[in-house]
Amino acid sequence: MTNIRKSHPLIKIINHSFIDLPTPSNISAWWNFGSLLGVCLALQIITGLFLAMHYTADTTTAFSSVTHICRDVNYGWLIRYAHANGASMFFIFLYFHIGRGIYYGSYNFMETWNIGVILLFLVMATAFMGYVLPWGQMSFWGATVITNLLSAIPYIGPTLVEWIWGGFSVDKATLTRFFAFHFILPFIITAMVMIHLLFLHETGSNNPSGLNSDSDKIPFXPYYTIKDILGVLLMLLTLLSLILFSPDLLGDPDNYSPANPLNTPPHIKPEWYFLFAYAILRSIPNKLGGVLALAFSILILMLFPTLHMSKQRSMLFRPVSQCLLWILVANLIILTWIGGQPVEYPFITIGQMASISYFCIILILMPTTSLMENKLLKW
């Protein structure tokens, strides 16, 4: 009798994806982030579902319903902070996952990479809409500022903004539709993740050397299942420490004040994981230019396969490119810092310099460095 694991139509799919999957024997801890993102997504959907049971998407009661969850619902505070800080963990892992992809040349799997970029956009949209739901000051003004950016689109802009708002300002209609989208998008993300994995399993995983590893594969279980479980335990330890010791570390105190359309907070800023993009947006004095720079700062990821000039796939044996990548990381950290600062000298200038460097490193320096390395290696 054949093993049910290999014969049952449904279990067979799981088997080929997580158990008998041939995996390179040399993938490092940088390959753990995919599974960690999966766990984060599951955690967000579960905590979100429980929050939705008690939340009301109405401007008059949204803020107090979140307060009610924290004060009166059994372990409501835990669910709420797990959801809020889980989003931060999600983005940390997303950025590590993308960084790994850039360092080891994983973007050469074109379909997998492009679906990954679409996933990033979907997760960013979901996080933005989720931030609006508690209906605090930063929720309201964040929604107003970010949706208003679309008014920079020529001709259809202003109409588009009012269409998204469902009125002439961010109000009840906006909150209701944001809740609807925030609820449905994670399930769309889950479907996209499955497609992401489908395309990944067509080619097999990349590995640190960037070389073909068909000659040296091991089964996913038990080797990488154990490795992934270790990653998950470390993640849960970090997340629980954050939730139980300083749950508001990454939040904004302004969001503990109910939304007031008549009172603008002194510094409007998004959650920390959007600050780098926000800094790029603010560094350009022109509204449309800023919006285009903002969009392109993420869309630029789609150009990586085209900009890959090296004869080697991975950066493992390319020290100059490695240096450039770490400069890019430092640059992104500077942008994140600038995004949280007020718009005044010297922050404006630093932000502009960092924004220019961001695009220059990716579009000019990295490809030219790759060509130089090819020359040095007489390739």
From Swiss-Prot:
Cross-referenced SUPFAM superfamilies: a domain/subunit of cytochrome bc1 complex (Ubiquinol-cytochrome c reductase) (SSF81648), Transmembrane di-heme cytochromes (SSF81342)
Binding positions (heme b b566): H97, H196
Predominant location category: mitochondrion
Binding note for cofactor: Binds 2 heme b groups non-covalently.
Cofactor(s) required for function per UniProt: heme b
Binding site for heme b b562: H83, H182
Localization, UniProt: Mitochondrion inner membrane
GO biological process: mitochondrial electron transport, ubiquinol to cytochrome c
Ranges annotated as spanning the membrane: 33-53, 77-98, 113-133, 178-198, 226-246, 288-308, 320-340, 347-367
Molecular function GO labels: metal ion binding; ubiquinol-cytochrome-c reductase activity
Residue positions binding a ubiquinone: H201
A cellular-component GO term for this protein: respiratory chain complex III
Classification via PANTHER family: CYTOCHROME B
Name of the molecule in the record: Cytochrome b
Taxonomic placement: Eukaryota, Metazoa, Chordata, Craniata, Vertebrata
